């Protein structure tokens, strides 16, 4: 019988159901006053909020272990005949973080009880992972723009928010990993089941895009009101974590307790107290209108005390906003002189309101006010069957819609829903089973139109289609016009997509003396759908003058694509955490990834599509491989008995099993199997297709780190880490030699990508008895690669070498700092001044980083296709690269005289990403007042300010030499980081780098 991984997975399911990644694990040692092990001590752990209990006994070495504990606050009771009983309250267990609590039992009667309070050690003495926990207290207190997760993710060292693209919207990088390599889980199951809204859905179809709303926010995963806490792990995670090599973000949702608790809130902002956009000020425009209402509530409590609990949450947002934008558009003279069939394309752009820029272009500065909205609701139930079995179920639903644009408008409509169920069973003192199942569904529809009323209706572009097809009445098209130096204009239905996920996660935990063994499996099926029924026409001009004259244009036509693929993923792992010595714990294990090629349904429009995939009569899109084994090892050592000092280190292999590349040929358009016609080479035309390099394998990352941690005074912790990684066989899309010809071009997905990252990271956790609580992180690092994106297309020639494109990563950030600080003034009695000063709280988030690297390009098009690396210019000697200009945004701009275009389609001597853009710094703060209403209820009033100092943070300069705005920044940073969709980042009003904005909050909480 042939080997089938699916059969192996089914056997594993029968044998080893699994423990969820969001659980915590408690262990420790029980000793007597002489430091000898106490055997047979009874340990009882009880959740202080729900009453849930688990028990264990200490072994021959005095050690104990209790697995599968939900994050929360616990009471631990330790009893042994001949010793006094110890009860420790307030032991906080955190998401995806093992905890250790040791006890020394005094000699005496067991009826005598000693009560102490305090949690586990502040130091991680259990594993080598580099990570950061964000708890409920910090979630509630921090000023979070848009009340989203993205601001909190930046608090982990090594993480940086990055510009999103239409193809990849990961929105942040972690320790040099690409932005589309992060894995999000909620309550132990994957929430990387989002769907993109753009024409390049590659990240979403492969299951590497988290569930987002139409605004690009992560509320599609979980609203902050329903989030208990989360942990971000960025290096050398244990074998139970995997699928993607980037950050592992483990989210835990809130549940009910024995006491009713809840909140009702309203977040409001408008432009009255806001600062004006820097570009609007320069233009003499007033502040842009802004209306934001974020409202909702939550309620949790018992259905039956100590047994059944519920938690409900709802959040809704209504937003109308606009942004100042500067762009080059066709001049009035150009519109009048253009050929009749060209004029409809020019009218997609708004009419100029600024001075001439030359070559038929003029300046336009303007703003578009557009509405956005989302609603997200969730319900969770928890039930305990005695002290051994717990059950839970969770349902969520999140519809959303957003409109955004500068010269054109994009309307995106999305829906997502999810159902999760889980069971946890302690079958014996040494064995715990856990199984979870998730079903998720998401859909999106994207439409484009122009803000210029002269653009008319869809059939307004009939003269364009007649020019190329000579058939009247062709109106049902999506049009995309790209002009070097200007950008692109889009009209029509861009995409109609869906995504379904089935996810089954079983695991087992065995506690055997000094060993804690975990083994399990992870089975996921994805079904990305494409329902695009509209043909697409793309026109590209290398310069604007050619467009006006209707010559030297590349044209591309794509037929409608409708179909689906079925992607199956199987993972398995086994690991052992071995307490070799009371001060040394070693964790080692293996993870196995199986990611076969997808099963594709026939496409009605392209029944021969599969034939285009194959090389040398391959029967699969790429070879099936069963040897994707990833060993990992780590150790934590406490070298000194009486010092709170720990040294940790680890190493591991991590596969990128995302299958985004598997559906590029089906979903990676919009121009799939398109025919590009270049009049310069007439009568020839170029057939553009997509394919995979023969022998394609999963990308691989090697990660390693060494960390030293020191605790101070039982409250503060300083961590110093060296973190490194090396990416091999990374995906890189290439077009050109040697497989392409003049009449047939193939864009190949290859394994030619490579990367390196080295970083020094410092984190300081502060908790002062005077009411000060802080978390600070600094990173000094360098990330290098020859491609920073799976979806970007690279030009290669016969003379191309991999080192030609090697340079700083697109997201390389040499220096980055983040800090979260809270200060609480305790209520006072006495004078009116003392009473007024009390109950005030101040919170702040600080962010600062150096600039992103940029590359000047002499041309972004070749063969009618946009490239990430085509073509870099030559650097002219004797000229400064940057010149000071007080009139330019940021006071400087790139010097056009420093760059000259190559004489042919070749790379110049300017290195990739050898220039750096503007740095960023911003302070957000919140002033809060708590007004007690009774012992359990209070009214919270908050005043939040984002970019409190109103420091202008500028976007990177325009990089195309063909643009009249070359070298100058077109907007503030928030517009570069995102434009507001899951395919192009979080909406700018919630991004870092915008003008100062003020928010007022009223919240009732009990």
Predicted regions and their residues:
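Short, solvent-exposed micro-motifs at the edges of structured domains
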Residues: 152, 223-224, 291, 583, ...
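Signature of Gram-negative outer-membrane beta-barrel scaffolds
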Residues: 477-484, 488-493, 500-503, 516-640, ...
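Acidic, glycine-rich flexible loop segments
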Residues: 112, 121-162, 166-171, 176-431, ...
């Amino acid at each position: 019988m042939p080997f089938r991984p699916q059969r192996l997975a089914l056997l594993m399911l029968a044998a080893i159901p699994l423990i969820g990644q969001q659980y915590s694990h408690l262990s420790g040692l029980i000793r007597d006053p002489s430091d000898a092990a106490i055997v047979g001590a009874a340990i009882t752990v009880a959740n202080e909020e729900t009453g849930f209990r688990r028990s264990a006994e200490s072994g021959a070495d005095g050690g104990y272990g209790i697995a599968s504990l939900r994050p929360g606050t616990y009471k631990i009771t330790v009893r042994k005949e001949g010793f006094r009983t110890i009860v420790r309250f307030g032991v906080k267990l955190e998401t995806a973080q093992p905890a250790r609590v040791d006890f020394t039992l005094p000699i005496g009667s067991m009826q005598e009880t000693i009560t102490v309070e305090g949690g586990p050690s502040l130091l991680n003495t259990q594993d080598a992972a580099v990570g950061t926990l964000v708890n409920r207290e910090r979630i509630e207190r921090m000023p979070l723009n848009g009340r989203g997760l993205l601001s909190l993710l930046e608090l982990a060292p090594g993480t940086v928010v990055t510009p999103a693209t239409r193809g990849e919207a990961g929105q942040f990088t972690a320790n040099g990993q690409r932005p589309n390599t992060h894995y999000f889980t909620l309550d132990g199951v994957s929430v990387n089941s989002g769907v993109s809204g753009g024409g390049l859905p590659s990240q979403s179809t492969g299951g590497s895009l988290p569930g987002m709303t139409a605004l690009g926010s992560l509320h599609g995963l979980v609203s902050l009101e329903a989030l208990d806490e989360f942990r971000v792990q960025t290096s050398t995670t244990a074998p139970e974590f995997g699928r993607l090599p980037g950050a592992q973000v483990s989210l835990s949702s809130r549940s009910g307790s024995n006491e009713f608790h809840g909140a009702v809130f309203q977040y409001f902002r408008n432009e009255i107290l806001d600062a004006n956009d820097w570009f609007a000020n320069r233009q003499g425009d007033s502040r842009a209108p802004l209306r934001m209402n974020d409202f909702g509530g939550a309620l949790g409590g018992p259905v039956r005390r100590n047994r059944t609990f519920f938690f409900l949450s709802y959040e809704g947002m209504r937003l109308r906003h606009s942004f100042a934008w500067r762009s080059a558009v066709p001049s009035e003279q150009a519109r009048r002189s253009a050929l009749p069939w060209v004029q409809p394309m020019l009218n997609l752009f708004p009419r100029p309101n600024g001075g001439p820029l030359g070559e038929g272009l003029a300046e336009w500065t303007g703003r578009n006010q557009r509405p956005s909205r989302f609603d997200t609701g969730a319900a969770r139930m928890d039930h305990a069957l005695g002290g051994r079995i717990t059950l839970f179920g969770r349902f969520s639903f999140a519809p959303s819609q957003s409109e955004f644009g500068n010269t054109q408008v994009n309307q995106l409509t999305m829906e997502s829903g999810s159902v999760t169920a889980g069971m946890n069973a302690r079958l014996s003192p040494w064995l715990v089973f856990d199984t979870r199942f998730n079903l998720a569904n998401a859909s999106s529809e994207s439409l484009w139109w122009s803000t210029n009323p002269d653009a008319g209706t869809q059939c307004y572009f009939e003269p364009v289609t007649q020019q190329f097809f000579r058939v009247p009445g062709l109106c049902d098209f999506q049009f995309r016009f790209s002009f070097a130096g200007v950008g692109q204009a889009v009209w029509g239905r861009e995409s109609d997509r869906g995504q379904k996920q089935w996810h089954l996660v079983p695991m087992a935990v065995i506690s055997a003396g000094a060993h804690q063994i975990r083994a399990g499996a992870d089975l996921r099926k994805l079904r990305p759908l494409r329902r695009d029924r509209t043909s697409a026409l793309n026109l590209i001009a290398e310069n604007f003058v050619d467009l006006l004259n209707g010559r030297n244009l590349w044209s591309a036509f794509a037929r409608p694509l409708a179909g689906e693929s079925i992607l199956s993923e199987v993972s398995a792992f086994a690991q052992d955490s071995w307490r070799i010595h009371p001060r040394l714990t070693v964790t080692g294990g293996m993870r196995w990834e199986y990611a076969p090629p997808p099963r594709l349904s026939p496409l009605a429009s392209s029944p021969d599509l599969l034939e285009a995939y194959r090389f040398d009569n391959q029967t699969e899109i790429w070879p099936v491989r069963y040897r994707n084994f990833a060993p990992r090892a780590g150790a934590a050592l406490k070298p000194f008995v009486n010092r709170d000092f720990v040294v940790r280190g680890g190493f591991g292999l991590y596969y990128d099993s995302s299958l985004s590349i598997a559906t590029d040929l089906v979903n990676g358009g919009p121009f799939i199997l398109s025919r590009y016609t270049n009049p310069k080479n007439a009568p020839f035309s170029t057939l553009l297709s997509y394919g995979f390099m023969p022998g394609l394998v999963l990308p691989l990352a090697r990660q390693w780190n060494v960390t030293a941690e020191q605790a101070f005074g039982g409250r503060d912790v300083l961590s110093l880490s060296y973190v490194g990684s090396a990416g091999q066989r990374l995906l890189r899309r290439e077009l050109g030699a040697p497989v392409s010809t003049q009449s047939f071009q193939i864009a190949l997905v290859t394994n030619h990508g490579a990367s390196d990252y080295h970083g020094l990271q410092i984190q300081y956790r502060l908790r002062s008895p005077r009411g000060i609580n802080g978390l600070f992180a600094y990173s000094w690092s360098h990330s290098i690669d020859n491609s920073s994106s799976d979806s970007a297309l690279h030009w290669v020639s016969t003379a191309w070498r991999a080192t030609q494109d090697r340079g700083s990563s697109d997201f390389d950030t040499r220096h980055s700092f983040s800090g979260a600080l809270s200060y609480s003034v305790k209520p006072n009695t006495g004078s009116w001044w003392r009473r007024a000063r009390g109950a005030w709280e101040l919170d702040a988030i600080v962010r600062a980083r150096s600039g992103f690297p940029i590359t000047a390009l002499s041309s972004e098009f070749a063969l009618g296709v946009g490239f990430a690396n085509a073509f870099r210019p030559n650097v002219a000697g004797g000229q400064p690269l940057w010149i000071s200009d007080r009139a330019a945004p940021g006071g400087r701009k790139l010097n056009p005289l420093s760059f000259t275009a190559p004489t042919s389609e070749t790379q110049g001597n300017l290195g990739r990403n050898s220039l750096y853009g503007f740095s960023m710094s911003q302070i957000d703060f919140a002033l809060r007042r708590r007004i007690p209403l009774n012992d359990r209820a209070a009214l919270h009033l908050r005043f939040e300010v984002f970019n409190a100092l109103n420091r202008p943070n500028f976007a990177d300069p325009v990089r195309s030499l063909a643009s009249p705005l070359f070298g100058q920044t077109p907007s503030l940073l928030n517009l570069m980081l995102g434009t507001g969709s899951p395919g192009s980042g979080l909406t700018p009003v919630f991004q870092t780098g915008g003008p100062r904005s003020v928010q007022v909050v009223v919240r009732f909480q009990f």
